[in-house]
């Protein structure tokens, strides 16, 4: 996942949950400016921060990183 897509997802998750950047930064144990850089794509959260973010939003790391692949079960394949 690109920094830009992760940044957008972090922004969306925070806003949907009505959290402030200050609050999320506090949960992560970083200053607000660092968290702001995550949302703008200037920095990438480390592994520990990603786990904390997934826990905060009650989603898996795969969902956070958009690694989950939707499978279309209606597609048939000829052998």
Each PLM stretch: what is its role?
Residues 29, 48-63:
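DNA major-groove recognition helix of helix-turn-helix/homeodomain DNA-binding modules
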Residues 18-37:
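Short alpha-helical DNA-recognition segment
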Residues 65-79:
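Short, charged recognition helix plus adjacent turn
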Residues 15, 29, 40-42, 69:
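Residue-level detection of the helix-turn-helix DNA-binding "recognition helix"
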Residues 1-16:
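A short, Lys/Arg-rich alpha-helix, primarily the initiator
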Residues 9, 20, 46-49, 60:
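Residues that mark the N-terminal boundary/hinge immediately upstream of a DNA-recognition element
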Residues 15, 26, 55:
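Alpha-helical residues within the helix-turn-helix
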């Amino acid at each position: 996942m690109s920094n830009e897509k992760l940044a957008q997802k972090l922004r969306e998750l925070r806003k949907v949950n009505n959290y402030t950047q200050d609050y999320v930064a506090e949960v992560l144990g970083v200053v607000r400016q660092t968290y702001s850089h995550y949302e703008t794509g200037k920095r990438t959260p480390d592994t520990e921060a990603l786990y904390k973010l997934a826990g905060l939003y009650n989603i898996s790391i795969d969902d956070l990183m958009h690694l989950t692949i939707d499978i279309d079960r209606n597609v048939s394949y000829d052998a």
